[in-house]
Regions:
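Sec-dependent bacterial lipoprotein signal peptides
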Residues: 1-18
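Hydrophobic residues embedded in beta-strands of well-ordered beta-sheets
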Residues: 81-82, 104-105, 114, 156-158, ...
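Well-ordered beta-strand positions in beta-sheet-rich domains
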Residues: 70-74, 94-96, 114-116, 167, ...
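N-terminal leader/targeting segments and the immediate start of mature chains
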Residues: 18-72, 246-250
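N-terminal mature ectodomain segment of secretory-pathway/periplasmic proteins
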Residues: 48-110
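Flexible, processing/modification-adjacent segments and terminal tails
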Residues: 40-41, 108-167, 239-243, 247-249
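Gly/Pro-enriched, hydrophobic low-complexity segments
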Residues: 152-250
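Short, solvent-exposed secondary-structure boundary motifs
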Residues: 61-67, 83-90, 136-146, 156-162, ...
Length: 250
């Protein structure tokens, strides 16, 4: 895989040629839930005020038609920006990715190329557009009560349908978000996010494995988190690009 392609895929934020333990089900196969939308929302841990920063490292497994790859990643994120550094299998740093509110800056150290892309610009590839996900929001997916229309259930899960057509699946016992399914034609850069292996860390229940699927379903990227720290003081969330390397705006 070319380094620049790997960076773009990492911008999915972070993620499995590996399978998922939760198998998606249509709500037509489920029964109406015995809880209200308010109760559904209250079951989900909400760290929007208390979880301010994340720092960690892990391994990203990338799977797309005809190829797969494995990359080591280090990341730092607050709620405004996310900085990701990745290395190849032999430990050579390949590049950095900085995701901000309206753009993603990609620096390919191997090819010495820097590109800045508007998050919602038409020139951003489908894979690259997955960079729109902030890491703190990715680890603690925000769910607004006002967006929930209906709730369904089976013996293990509650599934909510939102006013924009998303389906949000949570574990009935823990309230942990397990799966986010986007409707066709939603305009989102991904079709599905899957969460596994929650652990308790410094007052937060956070997933240790996250898988994101591209909109066409052909590409999957999974992050297996090895180390994770919360609410630390972060280094500057910026990329130091050497003099003489222009930033190409696409």
């Amino acid at each position: 895989m070319k380094p620049i392609t790997a960076i773009l895929i990492i911008s999915i934020l972070l993620l499995s040629g590996c399978g998922s333990s939760y198998e998606f089900r249509e709500t037509g196969d489920l029964e109406d839930a015995d809880i209200s939308p308010d109760e559904f929302a209250s079951l989900i841990p909400d760290y929007s005020d208390s979880l301010r920063t994340l720092s960690g490292s892990g391994r990203a497994f990338i799977s797309e038609p005809g190829r797969s790859d494995r990359i080591t990643v280090d990341f730092h994120s607050d709620r405004q920006a996310s900085l990701v550094t990745f290395r190849n299998r032999i430990g050579i740093e390949g590049g950095e990715l900085l995701v901000e509110d309206d753009s993603v800056l990609i620096y390919n150290r191997i090819d010495r190329v820097a590109e800045k892309i508007a998050l919602h610009d038409a020139s951003l590839s489908e894979i690259g557009s997955l960079a729109t996900i902030n890491l703190v929001d990715l680890f603690n997916y925000p769910v607004k009560r006002s967006a929930i229309d209906d709730v369904f259930q089976d013996n293990s899960y509650y599934v909510a349908e939102t006013d924009d057509g998303r389906q949000i699946t949570i574990d009935r016992e823990t309230g942990h978000v397990l799966d986010i399914q986007m409707p066709p034609g939603s305009g989102a850069p991904y079709s599905r996010i899957n969460y596994e292996a929650y652990e308790y860390l410094n007052g937060f229940y956070l997933p240790r494995k996250i898988t994101i699927f591209s909109m066409d379903g052909d590409t999957r990227v999974s992050l297996l988190v090895r180390q994770l720290q919360t609410n630390l003081s972060l280094p500057a969330l910026e990329i130091q690009i050497p003099d003489g390397i222009p930033i190409i705006t696409l």
